[in-house]
Amino acid sequence: MGRSRSRSSSRSKHAKSGKHNKKRSRSREKERVRKRSKSRESKRNRRRESRSRSRSNTASRRERERAASPPDRIDIFGRTVSKRSSLDEKQKREDEEKKAEYERQRRIRQQEIEEKLIEEETARRVEELVAKRVEEELEKRKDEIEREVLRRVEEAKRIMEKQLLEELERQRQAELAAQKAREEEERAKREELERILEENNRKIADAQAKLAEEQLKIVEEQRKIHEERMKLEQERQRQQKEEQKIILGKGKSRPKLSFSLKSPD
């Protein structure tokens, strides 16, 4: 099935290549015909220039003849009376020259028309002959062209497969590199988070240690204050007892009273 598709595609390619070859052959033949047409056109232009020069030479010759001829005599009625026969012959000769020139121009135009028709017919026949020969040559080389087309198709397939595999390998390498970069980025983020957590834990531990130390200081201060209060209370009670003893006369001599406050450490 694939073989038939490849053959049909090769035939279509073969037909296309045959058309391109025909077009190139036709274009080359048209170029040659165009060059021949230009050559003939230049020849016709040279002929026209030659005719125009001959006409100008004839006119100048006639002017010189008129200037060289003696003036005719004129009668009382204003008519020329001398050399009438020579003038008639001259006029007749001029008419014959005009007719001959006209006939020559007509033949030249006829020849140009015939040459153009021959040129067109030749170009048409050459084009048909070239197309026929190209078609015959393509038909002869049909199998060879098909084999060459199949070879090029297989080569193109191998090249495309190789390029596809290379592209897939490049994509795989790119994906691996991207994955590695993502893993490195995630690892760096984890390390940064761990460092931040460790720093925070250290700060919390330092803060807790400072807080515990402050609490110990506060407890120690409270203990000292409590001890001082107890001492003051004991001293106050002792003094009250002594005052009561004095008041009640239990003692023989009145003791000296002393009050002292200890400053907290």
Swiss-Prot record:
Basic and acidic residues composition bias: residue spans: 60-76, 85-106, 229-245
Region feature (Disordered): 1-106, 229-265
Region (Necessary and sufficient for transcriptional regulation): 67-265
Location of the protein in the cell: Nucleus; Nucleus speckle; Chromosome
Positions of short motif LXXLL motif 1: 164-168
Motif LXXLL motif 2 location, chain numbering: 193-197
InterPro entries, per the entry: ARGLU1
Keyword Protein biosynthesis (UniProt): no
Positions of the UniProt region annotated as Necessary and sufficient for RNA binding: 1-66
Compositional bias per record (Basic residues), positions renumbered to this chain: 1-54
GO BP terms: mRNA processing; regulation of alternative mRNA splicing, via spliceosome; RNA splicing
Gene Ontology molecular function terms on file: pre-mRNA binding; transcription coactivator activity
PANTHER family linked to this entry: ARGININE AND GLUTAMATE-RICH PROTEIN 1
Family: Belongs to the ARGLU1 family.
Protein name listed in UniProt: Arginine and glutamate-rich protein 1
Source organism (scientific name): Xenopus tropicalis (Western clawed frog)
